[in-house]
């Protein structure tokens, strides 16, 4: 039986492997050109090309201008492609009075798997009290929240929230941005049962996956690609070709997300 890296090297399907992309985006975005617009149809085509089972997306318009409209668009996508596209409920802490009502609209929809906040776009640090209504409700319901973090310091700044709201499963995105200080990442993630990271990153350094796995519990690492901001082939390839055991790759590529999101 060929190893995962051998299949990828020769352009063969990675058969019998569950691949779940836990961090993606859909729709137009104002800050850079996306020739295929990140439509749900395009994303499913990309999943099919790579043998990916499903992905969990957030609507770009939800961060930039209109979270209510963005969530409606996401609901349409998950209804059109059940089992292939799942969604995050996109929230904006600037509109803190709307957050709980937005969660309630979609929390019982099986197509939605959690909540997404984007700190860089919404310019609201994790210590802000504006997050509290959503955090308190999500903690009561035991929900999962994907938080945009960029660098080890940003990741570490999420730790107090994870300590306070222990029923929330927090995912810190783009964990390899802080790979130059892997001990700092590991200290936060490995000591908290409710803290995870993902691999979404467009320009990772060579060896960053191996370094992440060396320091961070691989059961806490989720496969994410930023589809369709960027081509998912890059992150898929660097995980499949990484110098780590195939069992670890299987956990990162899909088994960890399957457990966390009950997919």
PLM-predicted stretches and their roles:
Residues 110-114, 124-222:
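Catalytic pocket-lining loop regions of alpha/beta-barrel enzymes
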Residues 53-54, 62-144, 191:
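Active-site gating/metal-coordination segments in enzymes
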Residues 23, 47, 74, 106, ...:
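Conserved, mostly hydrophobic/aromatic
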Residues 23-29, 148, 174:
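Histidine-centered divalent metal-coordination motifs
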Residues 26-38:
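Acidic/histidine-rich helix-loop elements
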Residues 1-22, 37-54, 218-220, 233-263:
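Mid-to-C-terminal alpha-helical segments outside catalytic/metal-binding sites
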Residues 40-44, 71-78, 100-104, 135, ...:
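Generic structural signal for well-ordered alpha-helices
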């Amino acid at each position: 039986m060929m190893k995962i890296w051998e299949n990828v090297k020769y352009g063969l399907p990675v058969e019998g492997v569950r691949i779940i992309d836990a961090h993606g985006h859909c729709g137009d975005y104002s800050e850079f050109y996306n020739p295929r617009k990140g439509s749900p149809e395009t994303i499913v085509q990309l999943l099919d090309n790579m043998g990916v089972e499903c992905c969990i997306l957030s609507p770009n318009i939800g961060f930039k201008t209109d979270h209510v409209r963005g969530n409606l668009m996401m609901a349409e996508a998950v209804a059109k492609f059940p089992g292939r596209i799942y969604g995050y409920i996109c929230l904006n802490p600037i509109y803190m009075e709307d957050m709980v009502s937005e969660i309630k609209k979609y929390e019982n929809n099986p197509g939605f798997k959690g909540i997404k906040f984007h700190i860089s776009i919404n310019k609201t640090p994790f210590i802000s009290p504006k997050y509290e209504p959503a955090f308190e409700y999500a903690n009561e319901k035991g929900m999962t929240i994907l938080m945009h973090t960029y660098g080890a310091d940003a990741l570490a700044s999420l730790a107090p929230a994870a300590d306070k709201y222990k029923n929330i499963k927090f995912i810190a995105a783009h964990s390899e941005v802080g790979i130059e200080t892997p001990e700092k990442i590991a200290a936060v993630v490995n000591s908290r049962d409710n803290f995870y990271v993902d691999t979404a990153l467009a320009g990772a350094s060579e060896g960053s996956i191996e370094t992440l796995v060396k320091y961070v519990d691989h059961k806490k690492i989720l496969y994410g690609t930023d589809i369709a901001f960027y081509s998912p082939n890059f992150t898929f390839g660097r995980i499949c070709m990484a110098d780590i055991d195939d069992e670890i790759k299987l956990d990162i590529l899909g088994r960890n997300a399957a457990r966390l999101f009950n997919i």
